[in-house]
Amino acid sequence: MTIHKIGNLFFVLFCLMSCNSSSEKVEMKNLNGIWDKKTQQKFDFKIDDAQNPKNIIIVVRNNNDYPYSNIRFIVNATDAQTKKKSVDTLNYVLAKPNGEWIGKGFGDTKETLFQYKLNYKFPKNGDYSIGIIQAMRADQLKGIEDIGLKIETVKP
């Protein structure tokens, strides 16, 4: 194979791997390595196929400046039409007991996916929002680069 063909092959593979299916939505918020305790990260989204169950996943990208092995969140979910709210307090593990990050990634940044709600059926089509607040002791939580929300349709 010539170098030109190999380059084209890598380009096609990269494009295929970087595409999200239409049944998946991902939104990330950049925190620049510091997450203020008073700052809620809000994710607004529309559900057009409430009949299909969804997995709601919280995405965390941390670096080696993160001083803890776990992370705690307060999650506020709101139905935009009815204004009905639910609040969850969550605790997730970011590191093994030996201090090794469990997330995947190259270099200092690791990405970890945390299951928030699995096989969740939204009550109806419409607009929703999920707000995430860090609930750690530190007012300025260092080492969190990005926080995100991934919503995927459950495959039958």
Regions found by a protein language model. Give the residues of each.
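Post-signal-peptide N-terminal segment of Sec-exported extracytoplasmic proteins
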Residues: 41-68
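An anionic, turn-rich surface loop/hairpin at beta-sheet edges
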Residues: 90-121
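Short acidic/polar inter-strand loop motif in beta-rich domains
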Residues: 63-65, 111-112, 121, 134-142
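Noncatalytic modules at the cell exterior or secretory-pathway interfaces
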Residues: 51-58, 120-136
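Post-signal peptide N-terminal segment of mature Sec-exported envelope proteins
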Residues: 27-48
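Bacterial signal peptide processing site
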Residues: 20-23
